[in-house]
Structure formats: C-alpha cells, structure tokens
Amino acid sequence: MSHPLDNIPLLPHVLSMDYNVIIAGGGLNGLTLALALDSAGITTAVIDAFAPQESLSPKFDGRSYALSAASQKMLDALGLWEDLAHHAEPMLEIKVSDGAAGETPSPFVMQFGVEDFSQGPMGFMVEDRHLRARLAQATKASNVTLQSGQTIINQTIHSTHVTVAIDGHRPITAAVLVGADGRNSRTAKTAGLTRTGWNYNQCSLVCAISHEKPHHGIAHQYFMQSGPLAILPLTQNRSGIVWTEQQHVAQNIHSLSDADYLDILRPRFGDFLGEISLAGSRYIYPLSLSTTHRMIAPRVALVGDAAHAVHPIAGQGLNSGFKDVAALAEVLCDTRRRGQDLGIHTTLVEYQKWRGFDNAVLCTATNSFNKLFSNNNPLLRGIRDLGMGLINAAPKLRKSFVATAAGAAGDPPRLLRGEPL
C-alpha cells in the first residue's frame, strides 16, 4: 500500500553523503533499526565493535526476552518472525505473587490470561541467541552495510551532516548518527547527552532449566526479599530463570558448582514443574539504572539501553528499545518522504516527544517497583499483597495492565501495529 507522502519528490542534496543513517552498535536494537530503515529504502551503515564470531556465539548472551505482542508484530512486519516462530514460546498466562524460599505461595496473586487480551498471546519468549542469529541472517541478505569488529573513535557534527571516524578505516558521513551502543554509550557521551543512574547492588542470575512437567505457557514472577524471581516458558519443556539477589550473594551463588547452584534454586523455585536440571550455561549480570536526560542532540538520536537501561523487574527493556526503533524509523521515513533532510531538528524533536516521556515513566516505574517488592518489610508486604489482590479482582484494570505490557496501549508506531513503514 502506498503512503500519501510517497509521491513528493526528493529535494536535491547539496552534499553527497556515504549513507542516510549511521548506527553505532550492532546489537538487537541496532540491527532491527537498520532493517526497518532498509525496508523503506533508507541507506544505512552499522558499525559494531564485536566481531561476528563473538556476537553470534551461543554463549555471547544467555538471556531470554519476553517479547510483547507489539514487538512480535514489528518483527513480523519486517519479515523476521516466520523463521523465529519455531524458537518462540507463546506466553498464555502470567502469575505474579509474593514469595520466599521454602514458603507456600502467597494467596494474593495477580493472574493475567487470555481473557484479558483478545489479540492472542500476550507475548512470546525468545532466547537471545536465536533472535541475534535471525537478525544477522536478515542483515546479510539486506542492503545494510555492516562493519563488524570496528570501533568508532570520533563523531563530528556539521550543519548538514555528521562525520564518523572509525579506527583504522576512512571516515564516513550521513545525515543522522544513531547511538545503539548500550548503557555505556560513547555516542551519547560524545554528543554531550548526560546520564543519571545508580547501581542497585543486585545481580541477576540467568540460566535455562529443563523440567519434568509442562509449563503450559505460563510465566511466573515471585517477589522475594532480595529481588524478583522470574520463571519464563521456553520451548522444549524448558524455562528461563531470571533470579535476582544482592550482589555479594549472587556472586557467591554463581561461583558454586551446578549441583550446589540447583540446591539453592530449588526451594525458591518450588516443585510445581517436577524435577529440574540445568539446560545450558549460567550467567550473571549486575543491575543498574542508567538514563539520559534527552534522547537527541544535533544530528544524533539514541535508542534502547543507550538512552534508558532499566531494572528487568518488568521485563520491558528490549520492548522499550523496540518502541524506540519503531518510532525513530517512522519519523525518519516520513521525513524522507517529504523530501527533507533526515537530520533536521524538527524530526528529532518529534522522536524525543514520542518516546521521551514513555521512557521516563518506565525508568521511574521499574525503580519504584524494585524498591517496593525487593524487601520483606511487613507493612510494605501487606500493602503490595492487598494491591495485587485488588487488581486481580478488577477485570478492567487487569486488561489495562495487559494492554500496556503488550504494547497495545495508546497510539503505537506503524511497525508495532504490524504495518509496514
């Protein structure tokens, strides 16, 4: 279907640039943005510090992602989902409750199911290794220029373009530079985009387990004194574990043998899935909050963790990054259709307005949830148990929660509605 702006001719460019857009960082957000822009005919180069043999190693990242229904629609719109679908496990139900090792589950439970979301599964669990491999495969088959194992050493902003200097290679130019280079974003720092953040003194212990009984597509989240424990359904009778502990405790647990590790996990996990065993390597990730005050600077925009790295308590980190990707791709695509310079201030301001407030809310919410739920204060525990019970008893409120988590609330970008750019 043609877009109303498709028939507006492009204005002649005074400067011949190497690309329309340069993306710093070839992770999940960076490659997804590159493929989205490529689908709209916007020439893109991705500069990634990791060599392919590093980033595509099955042990590069042990995490799994709870992709929202909207994120799944975007991947489908970009032609990525068909090959990913057999690696994805639908989330049909979510149960949230207080918990403690060796205790019976709290009677106050928030339970979200198919009756709360009429559009199908609320989300899909996908392992990092499968998503990363599919993005790499699609990038190789696209018109995107991927320069792996290369490091950006400088960026210079001009009135008409940005020049990026790459260690050991010639500089390249584009209308816009996008920072998708993570929470320690060099792009953001060089652009003068200041950050706020702190460490939580917590780490997430991450692994996959095999279990005796089927999970039936149910995701569980228990709020323990030290932090949340998430049990997330994966394919082949496996579940992904995201187990948060205080930093020193987590480091001690991570250093244990597999057998001792499981001995500590079992009382927290319970026996509802029968006997459990490790189904791969174990990982540990320190947790922190890191957010920039703005997502844009002259000819620079940030996406994903480069702009907002949050606590995993709500499982929305990658989904939030994909919202950035969809919004930025849309405003750049529409600017191109109008025949305008992709890096003009009004375009980047539109992106900031679209995503800035939502990301600020996410940072505030995840930080507040972590403070509220990562403790065993009897008063706070009583308040949160009462709150969960009230939400569970209110169908309209449950549906609102699910719509927000699924990315279906508000006015999402076209890609998140499953529509092409």
Can you name each region flagged by the protein language model?
Residues Q251-H345:
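FAD/FMN-dependent oxidoreductases across multiple families
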Residues L15-M17, H87-T190, W198-C203:
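Conserved N-terminal helical subregion
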Residues K59-A101:
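N-terminal FAD cofactor-binding segment of flavoenzymes
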Residues Y19-V46:
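N-terminal Rossmann-like FAD-binding beta1-loop-alpha1 element of flavoenzymes
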Residues N29, P52, N184:
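Conserved Rossmann-like nucleotide-cofactor binding loop
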Residues D38-R63:
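Glycine-rich FAD pyrophosphate-binding loop
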Residues L75, H161-R170, V176-R282:
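Conserved FAD-binding catalytic core of PHBH/FMO-like flavoproteins
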Residues I8, E330-L421:
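C-terminal helical "tail/cap" subdomain of flavin- and related membrane-associated enzymes
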